[in-house]
Regions:
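Glycine- and other small-residue-rich loops at beta-strand/loop junctions that grip anionic moieties
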Residues: 87, 172, 195-202, 222-225, ...
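Conserved, mostly hydrophobic/aromatic
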Residues: 3, 29, 52, 90, ...
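Glycine-rich, aromatic-flanked loop segments that form ligand/cofactor-binding clefts
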Residues: 91-131
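Metal-dependent enolase-superfamily TIM-barrel catalytic cores that perform enediolate-based chemistry
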Residues: 117-239
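Structured beta-strand/loop patches that form or line metal/cofactor-binding pockets in enzymes
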Residues: 1-33, 37-38, 44, 328-333, ...
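Metal- or metallocofactor-binding catalytic centers and their adjacent structured scaffolds
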Residues: 26-102, 388
Length: 389
């Protein structure tokens, strides 16, 4: 059996373009799908998949680890987030092929189920771009949060951390604490609330913001500082009593290693569409388990990524909770028919072989590539300096 072709399919979903990767074989009707969606880098990911494809064509698709090693090590230049997103998409598709070939869901190939169902959380608006990133007032915040809870979720993530300079006055801190307090009052103690800092703050302000909301018990505070500085992250973790999460912008187990060695967080968040794929994420999770850290994978991406996330979550012992954005666009399930089922804030296992999805390429082509809305280019300090989005 050999890989005969690799091609990409780009689907614009407003907030981001989904980059689907199809790996075809010489066996009639046997192919697999993966996803490497990366905001504002769509054409680069498509290009890197095209560049990597010759290293895979002609290989036996069942030799997944061998192909990964070839792509990662024989490219000579170590791959960053663009290259690793390309590898991730190809690697996922190989698992889809192998599951179909053996007639089992991918999670059965990863050691089988360690849990009966997978807890989910979503964002304001269920992933609607403007609700997620443009809700900074109490009224809309409460309305959108209650709608999410009404849809069965028991956990929600919010992104209302102020855009911040290295130091800010008391006004932003008080406003942030008020929002979290009103949200906790509205949803009650039975709902977990995660706060995504989006890497917007330096340690001094991150610590002040977190201390201001500790009494409302966030489930975790995510990426309180930009991802480049492990020591800064450790400073935050040691200064607060709220669990700290990070990792969505790290790729490969080697970038996670300093986080583990310095115990710089409590929860890691690899993105299976960027970190190197399913097996690399399993290795990262195993490292985290050694350090008694939980795993809450990053996944605001497309429907292929959802299927990948389900397989990972069902088979990973230290998994905590799974991010989703299932209502980002109304036609999501027209493009990808999925065996994914939800119930009371949980994903349920599928018995469909492979990843359990079918991509409708005709429907997908109704939503061709468009340049994504670039929120980040408008974020400025009072003096006009650029801030982290």
């Amino acid at each position: 059996m050999k890989v005969t072709n690799i091609r990409t399919l780009v689907v614009n979903a407003e907030m981001r373009n989904w980059v689907f990767c199809k790996v075809e074989t010489d066996q009639p009707g046997l192919f697999g799908w993966g996803e490497g969606s990366l905001e504002w880098k769509t054409r680069a990911v498509v290009g890197v998949i095209e560049d990597l494809a010759p290293m895979v064509i002609g290989e036996d698709p069942r030799r997944i680890e061998h192909i990964y090693e070839k792509l990662y090590r024989q490219s000579f230049w170590r791959l960053g987030v663009i290259g690793m997103s390309g590898i991730s998409a190809i690697e996922q598709a190989l698992w889809d092929i192998k599951g179909k070939l053996l007639g089992v869901p991918v999670y059965e190939l990863l050691g089988g189920q360690v849990r009966d169902k997978v807890r989910m959380y979503t964002h304001l608006g269920g992933g609607d771009m403007r609700s997620v990133y443009e809700t900074f007032e109490v009224g809309p915040l409460i309305d959108l949060a209650l709608k999410v809870i009404g849809n069965g979720y028991t956990a929600i993530k919010v992104v209302f951390v102020p855009y911040s300079e290295p130091l800010e006055g008391i006004g932003k801190v008080k406003r942030f604490a008020t929002l979290m307090g009103k949200l906790r009052e509205a949803v009650g103690d039975a709902v977990d609330v995660m706060i995504d800092f989006h890497g917007r703050t330096y340690p001094a302000m991150a610590i002040q913001y977190i201390l201001a909301v500790q009494e409302f018990f966030p489930y975790f505070c995510e990426e309180p500082v930009p991802p480049e500085n492990v020591e800064a992250l450790l400073e935050v973790r040691q200064s607060v009593r709220v669990p700290i999460a990070t990792g969505e912008r790290l790729v490969g187990r080697h970038q996670f290693r300093p986080i583990f060695e310095q115990r710089a967080c409590h929860v890691i968040q690899p993105d299976l569409c960027h970190c190197g794929g399913i097996m690399e994420a399993k290795k990262i999770a195993a490292m985290a388990e050694t350090y008694q850290m939980g795993v809450a994978p990053h996944n605001p991406l497309g429907p292929v990524a959802n299927a990948v996330a389900l397989a990972f979550a069902l088979s990973t012992p230290n998994f905590l909770i799974q991010e989703d954005m299932l209502t980002d666009v109304p036609w999501r399930w027209d493009v990808v028919r999925s065996s994914l089922k939800t119930e009371n804030g949980y994903w349920l296992p599928t018995q469909v072989p492979g990843l359990g999805i079918e991509v409708d390429e005709e429907q997908a082509r109704k939503h061709p590539f468009k340049q994504e809305v670039m929120h980040s280019t408008t974020i400025r300090a009072k003096d006009g300096a650029v801030l982290d989005w």
